[in-house]
UniProtKB/Swiss-Prot annotation:
Leading EC class: transferase
Cross-referenced Gene3D superfamilies: Anthranilate synthase
Entry EC no(s): 2.6.1.85
Source taxon at top rank: Bacteria
Example GO BP: tetrahydrofolate biosynthetic process
Positions that bind L-tryptophan: S34, H41, N42, R43, F44, P238, F239, S240
Gene Ontology terms, MF aspect: 4-amino-4-deoxychorismate synthase activity; magnesium ion binding
SUPFAM superfamilies: ADC synthase (SSF56322)
Active site location: E256, K272
Protein name: Aminodeoxychorismate synthase component 1
Alphabetic keyword roster: Folate biosynthesis, Magnesium, Transferase
Amino acid sequence: MLSPAMISLPWRPDAAEYYFSPLSSQPWAMLLHSGFAEHAHNRFDIIVAQPRATLVTHGQLTTLREGETVSTSAADPLTLVHQQLAHCNLQPQPHPHLPFLGGALGLFGYDLGRRFEHLPARADADIELPDMAVGIYDWALIVDHQRREVSLFSYDDPQARLAWLEAQTAPVAATFTLTSAWRANMSREEYGEKFRQIQAYLHSGDCYQVNLAQRFTATYRGDEWQAFRQLNRANRAPFSAFIRLDEGAVLSLSPERFIQLRQGDIQTRPIKGTLPRLADPEQDALQQQKLANSPKDRAENLMIVDLMRNDIGRVAEPGSVRVPELFVVEPFPAVHHLVSTVTARLPAHLHAADLLRAAFPGGSITGAPKVRAMEIIDELEPQRRNAWCGSIGYLSFCGNMDSSITIRTLTAWQGHLYCSAGGGIVADSEEAAEYQETFDKVNRILHQLES
C-alpha cells in the first residue's frame, strides 16, 4: 500500500503548459489537459514522461519494453496492461483530491477494438501509429484548477524529479504551418452513396444507427505542440490531450468523457446530438432549445444510452446501472452537444481494465448494435480510424480510471495531419444535414490551423 511522496509547487493556471513545453518533443511525454474550459469537468491537467515501461500494440502483437528488456505477446492488450500494473506492486489508497497516482496512461486507438470483437479488414490501414500506446508512469505533475494547486508526486524522489523537470529546456522548434489545403477522403457524391447504403441497412432492420465519418488530410511542417497549444486555447475542450510517440503525435480536443471509475463508481457521458453555435445570443439560445427538443437527436442519444447501459452492465454490479441525466444540452465554443450520463458500480473483484474492455470502443462513435455498426463502418469508410474515436486516458495504481472519446482529434504522422468527423445516421436522418454536421464539428479546428 505504498503511497507516493508528494510536493507542492507554486500555483499558476498555465502550469501544465509551462512544465510540459520543454518535454513536448520527448517520445512518451503525455499531457491530459482540461482545456482551460468553463465546464464542470474542467479540473485536472496531468503531465507524465519517462515511463518505467511501455506497451505498444500493432495488430495481434504487443511489445513490452522495461529498461533494456523487450518482449512480445499475443495476449489481450488490456490484460497485459493489468498485469504490468500488478507487476509494479504499487497499490496506494485513493487520494482525496488527486485522481491519478501513477499507473498506465496513453492511447487506446479505435482499432484496438479489433482485439475484442471479430471484425472484417476491408478499410485501408494507412497510418502506422499503434493500436495501443501506453506507458507505465511512477510520477506525475497534476494541476488542480478547482483547488488552485500544483502537485508533483513520485514513488522515488519527487525533489529529484522536480530538479529534472526544471533542467529541461525546450528545443528550438520550427514554426508549425500547413503546407497544403485540407482534402477529404470522399466526395460529396461518395458520401451520399454511403449514406444511402446505411439507410438501406437501417430500413431492412439490420441496425438502428451507424456513425459515418469522412477524413480530412493536409501536409504540414514544424512543431505539433505549437499547433496543439493554439487549438487548445481556442477550443477549451475538457478532455484535451497531447501525446508524443516515436512514430508521431496525437492532438486531441475532445469534449467527451468515455468512462470514469472512481472508488468503484462508474460514469460514462455519451454525446449524441449536435448543432452549431450562433453568434447572436438570442439565436444561440433558440439553437439550444431546438437541440433539446429534437426528436431525431433524442432518439439517437437514447439508442447510445441503451448501448452504454448494456456494455457497462456486462461487468457492473447487478441492478446498479442508472441514468441520472438524460438529454442535457452542453455548449462548447463551436457547437452545442446533447449529453446523457450513465452510472453504475464495479464489483470489487474486477479491475478498470475489465470495464474498459467491456465497453470499448465507445458506442457514441459506432452506432447500434455496436458490432454490426462497426462492420458497416469498416465496409464504408475508406481508411481505418486509428487514433480517432478510440480513447485517451489512464488506469491508476489506486484503481481509478478516466478516459475520453478521441473525437475532435488530429493524428500527425510522417508530415501529414489527419482529422476526421462523423455523425450518427438513423432512419429519419437527412443526407444534407448529416454531411454538414461533419463540417460543423471540425471546421473551427481546420480553419484555425490554416491561419
